[in-house]
Amino acid sequence: MNFEKLIVKHVQELVPYQSARRIGGHGHNFLNANESPKSEGYFLNSTTFNRYPDCQPEELIERFADYAGVHKSQVIATRGSDEVIGLIVRAFCEQGKEGILIAPPTYGMYEVAANTNNALVATVDRHEDFTLDANQIIDAVKSSKFPVKVVFIDSPANPLGIVFKKEELEKVLNALEDTLIVLDEAYIEFAQKEHDLTYLVKDYENLVVTRTLSKAFALAGIRCGFAIANENIIKALLKVIDPYPICDPVAQIAIQALSDHAVGMTLERAKCCNERREKLRADLNELPFVEKIFESHGNFLLVKFKDGPKVFNRMAQKGVILRSFETKKGLKNCVRISIGSDVELEELIRYLKELDI
């Protein structure tokens, strides 16, 4: 039997998202996935594990809504914010006819979600310094050869680390009232408070903000994310989500993580991470083969080396796993370094100082 003939044509051509775990690497010091270097302790009540969970656990939705400063009707919980991205494309883009707009280099899951759902992909060029303004996005949407239903903007951006300004976002929202604007705030806890634009959801019906517990909350392993939007968008997403997206252990842990005390610890952890990030920046600036260190509002630094592949490969040989962006648009010789623990970062700098480049 020729199984290829059974597979849908666009699925045959898919390239899976190359996550840090999928790329792999043998090492002991993993600075490639923007994870927290430390896991917190939580408790589980196993007496309900024999029952199917609620699709949207009420206490979890209420806790996150309180944390984000929105009404619970404006929130949907998902298996990480990656699932939200896929749900948005599935619910709002007609297969083969409509699509999304992205601004490379950006988070790879936007394009993967579009390809998986047979949606089209348009791109907009960034400025030479990788910044992005409203006029670029508006012009790209209006000049697209197909209807752009969704625009994805990550802020802080991954892997660039920069933020999208409030005035630029509002200009886009006002000019593209019939387009869904998705603001990915996966790293927002590491940024200054003024960069959190979630509150704009109350003023703009076409704005969706995505969040995750994977980064600052140090819960990448449980896969829990959220979308914040007007009630009609949330209802549409609930139509295409699986029946039981949030399993009971995940809900229990996430609810604990969103308590006032735990949130306070998370924000303090993010502050300490930022301090380590700037210490790492200072240490890297002393190395003669570092050409540029990008601005960062996340738990990572994007670094341009004189020879990025050599740095990446030599660190891997030492068991320090970084993330290369060598093949991404405009990022030749660039390597992203996650902000690990003091010990992990000290080891990285020690090995980098041994390099002859």
Which residues fall in each region the model found?
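N-terminal "arm"/small-domain region of PLP-dependent enzymes with the aminotransferase-like
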Residues: M1-E59, R63-D66, P147
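PLP-dependent aminotransferase-like
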Residues: V11, E58, A91-I153
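Phosphate-binding glycine-rich loop
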Residues: P57-G99, N117
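Active-site phosphate-binding strand-loop segment of PLP-dependent enzymes
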Residues: E128-A191
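PLP-dependent enzyme catalytic core of the Aspartate aminotransferase-like
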Residues: E167, Q317-K318, T327-I357
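PLP-dependent aminotransferase class I/II
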Residues: N206-E286, K292-I293
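Conserved PLP-binding catalytic core of the aspartate aminotransferase-like
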Residues: N274, E286-K318
